[in-house]
């Protein structure tokens, strides 16, 4: 009887240890996924150029930055999950937009399959063309004609990046892109709330495959990063310590 009781206790402890190990493994994997999916440091800091540095000289550390409070990812269509924008920051005083564009290594595999290639696209090469398209309202007094079916009232203008910094982290590939000449904010009210320009209806990020680049065709993916009238997702902020350090370093060059 004693031997049977001892055996039962051993089996019970073994089962508990096995269950504990399984729980620990699952939690470990989840934590790794959370930590590994965060943007690398190079992708979370403002990338200085002459335009933003001039604005910083005028405004100092009170330089206003408008950024999204959430990631933006393609959630439907043939390129579902291929691309995302993890940060989009408008700097009104510099007429500038900076975004952090991200895609998974699996995107290289799926895009290769979409284009009939035998092997996944090689990591580290310049496969994708990333631009910004802005929809301008040519008749801001009439809100009933603000769609693509009214080309006489809505104009689309494409902006090319003026700078690009690349990085990788685990399974992800990143690009920090700067776009100059983009002015979506007319100023700020007494409470510091941005006054958005009513003639700018929306701001999109378009992704094309460089081997099949044709702006007259549909892009591989499109991400909406700003929509007039939906300013709830836009947060007003100022440069953090890393941004200030980067701007100060740029000014010393």
Regions inferred by a protein language model and the residue ranges of each:
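N-terminal Sec-pathway targeting helices
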Residues: 3-24
